[in-house]
């Protein structure tokens, strides 16, 4: 800390200003305002961050000393003002806690009550927010003994005013000889860190990480120092070098990482104007600019900044693991005789932890850099890696070069890991943590720490990739069969499970390069398989899976699975049952690893339907596609059987059906046809819309709720319906719209509640929805077409230009309008309003929300029930949609595309 810095605080000038005024408050406030402005300016000009946070603590010291001296504490008073916690370390960020301990010799506070109250009131009046406690030395001891947080806080303290002897006494009575011996303290702190990491999902890669508390954050560095201080009395990172727990290069890396996070935290506080340790989307772009990052053709500035952040915290996590493992070996020595169990000439187990048999193992036999992970997969009882061996792994990474990568011993070992019966994910994570995986596979090294700046992908590319492999492994567990019944069954019968893991490792390997990552990744996957001597069939399968890893999900969510042509086209792409099995399992794992909230019963049912229908098509043979007329006859016959049993006249049913057209029977099950028909025939002819609601029984819509609406067709039917559903907090997943020759509309919507669950059999909720829809459809002119609701905070930071594409489906005689746009409340109602303005009818719709973006497909016709054929009309429609969907967006529009 500086001895004196007049630009920050000029004691003489401050005293002079105090003397001129009757109240000290203005002078104190001016001094605080001045040093804050100076320090912020120094930060913006790039001054050393360590000096800045120490200078801020020094400035607060000066303010507190001046405030303390204004009160009469008596001669030789046994009272001291002590800085504790981060402030006690002499580190303060702009809005960090200023934690103070007013330390007394005895519990009798009465003689100091008045000056203490006056002192704290003055601090409040001048705007210095502090956290304070008033304790005697004995009270400190009692509370520290009972509370890990208290003892940790008191370990870092310094006297600001008053006799330092009180603090020294307090340190003696709270020392490890009296409480919290180093072993007990280490175990408690390690458990505390584990709980804290669990709070952040045990990953450094959260979308909005906490720079202080998340894994790899500042708290992880401080935890190491607290443990060291309790055991060795060491106070800083350099002391750990002297004690042999760090080497100089590791110490330098930790110090530079700490300084980077300090700069991020300082910027966060400055931008937020308050104590803010979460790296929120609100601030990520601003800090990226502040740190000098700029967008380029491949990556946004914010993505480059966050990749730097993630790589820094991953490095901290790696060293945190190493040092804590080292501490464990020193602080928790085994009370039993050391157990040595040889594994081979290169490795042995020492009390359950694997270690090298001599320090030159990796130098003499470089293949051991991979062998150690294979051994851990083969011996799941191994607890971990000993600290010295972790350091040797880190120090030997340079041995992995092109010659190493093409050595058949190494390629064989790497493939052997994928063939292990267990431990694949765990040891790939270890390889990544210790820097081996990215070194062995340089293409993987490029995606380490690479974020995708959206809400759909909540992990970095490398974390997502390893999570995918974790989910693949979970599918093998018996307890997962209930949640993933089909995937669990399929993965057990895959002929070569190692191929799905390799495909998983490579499926996103080309992210961030520009271009189609699926195609680029397929090339990388093929090269990997060839260099690892995989047979031709295996190589082609892995490459095909990488190239097509998105196709099944896209087909299930964006195409009409009741259309036989959709199933036929997908079956043609897949080609055989083996490819279908591998692709289905990979897709399930990919969705789960992308974002846990994406996997719900709705998406599960869509994928299951696509898998089942494709399996039938493959069994039937691609040369024998479904006969549409036969499918219609089967549906009508089965529906008629149900209706006749329920007392419905066959002629009445067939008369109604004659008005509906083929699409209706292709897009509904026999059960739903019977349900609709019976309700329509029994519905009074009084102009009131018929609204039916039930849990859907269709396989592709399992776990959704089906809303069927039958009413006289009207110009604004779709717009009013979707606006009403939006106001009823319903999320539309699918829309099937049929207009009869008698100008009645038969609309089927598959919906979920806004929270993603089905409506269920809640009579009150069903009545609310039915009444709301009937009222809206009976009074369309009174109904608001767009619901104005607040845009959630996170969505605001992922605005992008809407894309609108129009093409023609000649077979179905409809125009296909695809919309990709930022998700916003009332978005479907906005789109429906545009359709209304252009006199368009919606025949079908597929709705998909992916994080902050929607990818919706509408099958539309014009007023004559024909596809859109006028290019000028299409351009005006696109322009209107883009303008409407760009509101509150703030981004330029992207080029749109029209195909006829």
UniProtKB/Swiss-Prot annotation:
Molecular-function annotations in GO:
[protein-PII] uridylyltransferase activity; phosphoric diester hydrolase activity
List the InterPro entries: ACT-like_dom_sf, ACT_dom, HD/PDEase_dom, HD_domain, NT_sf, PII_UdlTrfase/GS_AdlTrfase, Polymerase_NTP_transf_dom, UTase/UR
Per its record, the protein catalyses: [protein-PII]-L-tyrosine + UTP = [protein-PII]-uridylyl-L-tyrosine + diphosphate; [protein-PII]-uridylyl-L-tyrosine + H2O = [protein-PII]-L-tyrosine + UMP + H(+)
- Cofactor dependence: Mg(2+)
Q: Where is the ACT domain?
A: 706-789, 816-891
Q: Supply the name of the protein.
A: Bifunctional uridylyltransferase/uridylyl-removing enzyme
Activity regulation statement: Uridylyltransferase (UTase) activity is inhibited by glutamine, while glutamine activates uridylyl-removing (UR) activity.
- Residue limits of the HD domain? 461-583
Q: Which gene encodes it?
A: glnD
Record remark: domains? Has four distinct domains: an N-terminal nucleotidyltransferase (NT) domain responsible for UTase activity, a central HD domain that encodes UR activity, and two C-terminal ACT domains that seem to have a role in glutamine sensing.
